[in-house]
Amino acid sequence: VGAPARNPVKEGKDLYNAAYFLYDGKIQQVIHKTLLPTYDVFDEYRYFEPNKEFKTVQFKGQKIAVTVCEDIWNVGNDNPLYTVCPLDELRSEQPDFILNLSASPFSYKQHEERTKVIQANCQRYGIPMVYVNQVGAQTELVFDGGSIVADAQGNMAKRLPFFEEAFEIIDTKDLVKENDA
């Protein structure tokens, strides 16, 4: 679940943009967003402190690299907007798969760009990805959904529909088995 999280230290901004990993009615772990965009419709750095700690989520015998939206867009540190690449940092934890929670707004051909970024990350790190994108609208922004499951080679294992809510159960152990094959 995406929501703001309080920054417990007095330095920096008061809040983090965060993903809450929930299980059995409890918060298991809070993951802070690292890359805070300040272009186009985004002005996140104005409100949020960037993440500086990188840890996977341990869940039912799997290590999950949980990332928030923009955190996957700095593939291989080649984006001059950022000096850190979250997946470079998380790679040392040897995650079984990447879970990216996004609220990426619709624009013409944006789904093609997202697919390229997802494929590039899977291929670069050899790790499968579950990319979950918001669907709906918020003021003047429209979110088109189109969530994706990709294997470690970047092949699309599943794509959920655009512009409608969808629910899909994904057996992540199957993704990991494909990765090991």
Give short role names for the model-derived ranges:
Residues V1-A181:
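Enzyme catalytic cores with a strong preference for nitrogen-chemistry domains
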